[in-house]
Amino acid sequence: MQFSAYMLDVITDSIYPARISVEGGFFKEIVPIVINDDSELDISGIILPGFIDSHIHIESTMLTPAQFAKLAVRFGTTSVVCDPHEIANVAGTDGIDFMIENSKSVPFNFYFSIPSCVPATCFETSGAILDSETIGELLKKDEAVALGEMMNFPGVINGDGEVLAKLEKAKELGKPIDGHAPLLSGKDLDKYMAEHISTDHECSNFAEAIEKKEKGMKIMVREGSSAKNMEALFDFSDRLDYWKNHESFGKMPNEVLEKRIHLPIFDFIVSDDKHTTDLIKGHLNESIKKAIDLEVSPISAIEMVTVNPSTHYNLNTGAIVKGMQADYVVVDNLNDLNILKTYVAGKCVFDGENVLFDVEETEFKNTFDVSKKESEDFEISCDEPSADVNVIRCFNGELITEAESATLETKKGFVQPDLEEDILKIAVVERYGGNSIANGFITGFNLKKGAIASSVAHDSHNIVVVGTNSEDMANAVNCLIDNEGGFAIVDGDFEDSLALPIAGLMTNEDSHEVAEKLEKLHKTAADFGCKLDSPFMTMSFMALLVIPAIKISDKGLFDCINFEFIDVIKN
């Protein structure tokens, strides 16, 4: 196949007309040409390399890899570096093998980073354990391009033997190591990076990202469903101040400074966790457009999802050059970025209207071993007339929480929530046969009635539930048990849910059906008073102990700064 078109050369940062030859799924020849008029070209618009999401957990879309691919190609995405950390916590190597095999059923490039922290910590119950020897074998797979995010930064800093052994396996094979180091700085950051950990996607402010970048880390700018860091990291005034304070500022001609200001400074744009309700509206194409709105140059933004991740992970895609796999998209222009066609290995997979491949239904043995619950399971006892309690404060669009305190009344020996002050109940129910339950309090949801529950609860994916009363919490959890996973919302006799029977994380359903059901749940939660844009996703991160400041696992309330359990009721 041969055609002529304008193409974006991400190696030279330029756009020019070229004759492009594709053979056997690879670019055979790229020849710049001279034209008198655009009508001489075979294809109108601009040819770009296919987009690469270099850090995403497919399970967070609630879709199988194949269903994800069917949706993503509509938006110009042809490749992902995915970390199957979620299903690995549920089902270990069987879960990882499922993701790899399912990904092979569709024309799309799935590269895998091997989960490094299963379980994420020793302070929670997961469905599996991946030790250093197992990780070493998984890293030898052809599909494995990196060691997944090292969330146990205390283990790295303190020289934990097993943690360091996992890192050594990646070093021996010459594979990059992804990081996870929220708010880590100074000497602790130096120790962390000394172990060859080369990326971070957890930066939530410009100063944090700059420190890591200047020390040699590659920064992933995250724009997901729950965590959105692009505005903070692409802030124009911060970029301007950075370059003004740069040692070379006084030597820069004005035209050079003007160009520098529109460079992103950082390296990749990633999703991390993306709900289907957001994904059906767009993927990296929308993130690129947002970056452009934040005054990042279009070519630089596109390079953050093409050649930059390709180079870092040693992928044979990400640029339109001889010998690389012919993954490319046709767009109308660099600003509107409307996807006209998408190609993978030289074959059209999206023609502007329809996806040109089918997805078959798949099965996976579930892991849901938990007994039905009663309202009494969600009570916190106290003999005093009131109790001073620790409270988790969550924020819209953020994974980070804050620790707060509240004084709550007791009734019949149980501590009561305070709906007027938005102090609700939260609990985590272990789903792997132990049936343990930890209860606590949370603020930020603003529910005025009912309860919501989820079997998506990072990272061990036990059941997490937030509610205004114990009875609705029990019923919401029992609904999930009946469905073998998913999301549920309950208020008295009212009940609605989205079943996720594949490991309690995913479904075979079409993306638009999933999105429609989830949107309905979001609307119901809003009708119940919830102010969060993505309440189920926000709730799912309340059990993620590796992100500060206070979270909850099936073993209790947890101080993520000092890595220790704390009492719900203060002494």
UniProtKB/Swiss-Prot annotation:
Catalytic activity annotation: adenine + H2O + H(+) = hypoxanthine + NH4(+)
Class of this enzyme: hydrolase
CDD domains: AdeC
Gene Ontology BP terms: adenine catabolic process
Gene3D superfamilies: Metal-dependent hydrolases
Keyword terms: Hydrolase, Manganese
Pfam family, one: Amidohydro_1
Keyword Hydrolase carried by entry: yes
Its EC number(s): 3.5.4.2
Cofactors that this protein relies on: Mn(2+)
Source organism, top-level taxon: Archaea
A GO molecular-function annotation: adenine deaminase activity
Record has NADP as a keyword: no
PANTHER family per the UniProt record, alphabetical: ADENINE DEAMINASE (PTHR11113:SF2), N-ACETYLGLUCOSAMINE-6-PHOSPHATE DEACETYLASE (PTHR11113)
HAMAP family for the chain: Adenine_deamin
Entry's family note: Belongs to the metallo-dependent hydrolases superfamily. Adenine deaminase family.
Protein name: Adenine deaminase
Protein species of origin: Methanobrevibacter smithii (strain ATCC 35061 / DSM 861 / OCM 144 / PS)
The gene coding this protein: ade
